[in-house]
Structures are given as C-alpha cells and as structure tokens.
Amino acid sequence: MATLGCAPKDDGEGKDEGGSDRGDGDPKPKGKKEVEAHTRREADERAVRIPIPEVLQQRLADDCYYINRRRRLVRLPCQTNVGAILECYVRHFSASALASGDRRPQPQRAAPERSVGLCREMADGLRITFDHALPLVLLYPQEQAQYEMVTSSTFFFPTEERASDAGRSQEAPWPGPSPPQPSESQAMAGPTAPKRRRVETDAARAPRRSTRHSTHCHWQAEDRASPQAKRSVPKLFPHLQKTPVHSTALSPIALTPGKEGSAMFAGFEGTTEEINEILSWKLVPDNYPPGHQPPPPSYIYGAQHLLRLFVKLPEILGKMSFSEKNLKALLKHLDLFLRFLAEYQADFFLESAYVSACEAHYSSKNPRTIC
C-alpha cells in the first residue's frame, strides 16, 4: 500500500519535467487524487460517531488501568452478564414508554426513539455483535488465556446438573436473563409466608459465614448472600420491583405495586397485560444456549467488556449498510442505552469485579453455574 501511495507523486514529477506535450498525462494523476479525496470526504461524511458519556470514559480508563497496569482480570462469569444488562434496559425503556402514556394503537406513529420494537432490535443486535466481536477486538492480550478457559466445554456444569441445582440453590446470580421471580407475589398471597421467612432467616446467616472468606471474595459473597443483596434489581427497577409476574402464567395477574411503583402505575387501569408483557419479555428463549455447548460471551462477560464494544462500534457500523433514517434511529437508541449505563454505572462497574490473575484462574478451575 505504501508503494501505491507514492506512485502518483513520482509520476507527477516526471510529467512536470518532460511530459507537457502529452495531453492525457496530467489529468490521470490529478483525476486519481480527486477521486481519492472525494472518497475520503465520503468516508468522513459516513463516519459513525457514538459519543460516550464522560463518566463512562473514566470507567474505560479505569478498566485499562486495572488490566494493563495492575495485571488484574474481571472475574468470570460475571454476576450481571451482558444479556441481563440488555434485557434489563429493554424493560426499563418499555416501562418508561408505558409510564409516559405513549401507547399508540399503531406503532408506526411513534417516533423511532420511542419505539419499543426498535429498542428490542437494538438490544438483540448488540448481543449478537458482542458475541462475535469479543474474541476478535474486545480483549487485551492478558485476557486471551482466560477467554480460552471460560469458553471451553469443561468450564460449566452439564445441563442436567444445572437443572437439578437450580431447584436447590438459593444463590443464583442476578437475573441471567430472567423475569423477576414470583417469590414476592407468593409471600403476599399469604399461605407461603412462613416459607419466605425461613428463606430470609437462612439468607440473614449467610453474610456471617461469608466473613470467613478472603477479602477478594467478599463482593461475591455479599452479592449472592440473599435476595435483598441483589442490589441492582431494586435500583434498576425502582418502580417495578413490587410488581410480581409469573413467567408461566398466560393470563394477566393482579399487580400490587408498592410506594415506589404506585406513582409509576397510577391511572393505568386496564394495562395489566401490557405490564406483564414488559416484565415477562426475554432477550433470548429459555432453551438458549443449548445445553451441549458453552454459553456465548454475552452470558459470561459483563458491563466492562460491553462498554469496550462502544469504542469499536463506530468502525463496525461504518462497514454495514444502513439507510440514513435507520442509522439515525439506531444511533439514538444506542445513545439512550449509554445514558442508562451512565446513570447506573455505580451498580454495573464495580471495582471489586477485578481480581488477581491467580483468583481468576481459581474461579475458572471451580466453575459456577450460569442461570
């Protein structure tokens, strides 16, 4: 490519000295330069720009510092994976649209940036792009060995073990991805209240046991100690946390929003089905990924690597074919998602997520179930 870049200049010098009588000599290099300049201008005009909020830029800088300077790694699998974050955002967006009263009978009348359907498409597109891009452009060299290990078939429990453990374990990671569990609705119903109290009693003991572990593991023990310790759920859904939903129920259920949710759902008579649809929506089917293969990166990695994608995303989108209208709508939804990450960055970007390479290796040798 360097040779091609120098050729026009050399040819032009020769023609200036002795090629004045060649009528078609000058236009060729001049025309080529004009074409190249025009191509560069077109590329600049088509360049996709995704501004990253300053607070998230700082998170990227911190991420680079922890990985490259302090030689740390993100502990995998993450408690809150990329799929859960995207699913959480779509529900957040949908609930906000419902709260704003934007319930047009014909979806095409809604502005693109307020379209729940486009929001869901954006989230699914990010998930797919993340799964493909992570091993190619989103990892530092120090993370390659960890990636090879966590994507191996021996890292995760077999499907049968996962299914049997799911019924016994009380320490499943925060929603990966799944709708809110029906424990609160069962507790409100009355008959199962004693059982709930027993669970809370057991959970209350867990933090005392967790103090025996090293400080490096404290974040994991604290996050998984009890349902109340899943900090992101109430913070990310302050209006929806009191709204139970049965994932297997086809008919609408009675909603019992608390003080936080009362303002959110005030005056929403007749919208029970819409609220249920928001809360029960899933980014991927229940049977994904198949049990015979390791989960994709979006089930293993979290916010740290998802944010890295937005650094590479302009280049990736620039190589895709979009109409101006569709690209504008997509960029608007990406901007809204980045604002969401910035607003809740304290929940997603935890310093305690970075552990020593030794501890990261230990967690890889002792894999945890992905739910």
Swiss-Prot record:
GO terms for biological process: chromatin organization; regulation of DNA-templated transcription. It holds the Pfam family MRG. Residues 1-44, 160-229 are annotated as: Disordered. GO terms for cellular component: MSL complex; NuA4 histone acetyltransferase complex; nucleus. Residues 206-216 have a biased composition (Basic residues). Residues 44-367 form the MRG domain. The keyword Transcription regulation applies. Its main location: nucleus. InterPro entries: MRG, MRG_C_sf, MRG_dom. Residues 8-44 have a biased composition (Basic and acidic residues). It is found in: Nucleus. Keywords: Chromatin regulator, Nucleus, Transcription, Transcription regulation. PROSITE patterns: MRG (PS51640). Probable non-catalytic component of the MSL histone acetyltransferase complex, a multiprotein complex that mediates the majority of histone H4 acetylation at 'Lys-16' (H4K16ac), an epigenetic mark that prevents chromatin compaction. This is MSL complex subunit 3B. It comes from Rattus norvegicus (Rat). The gene is Msl3b.
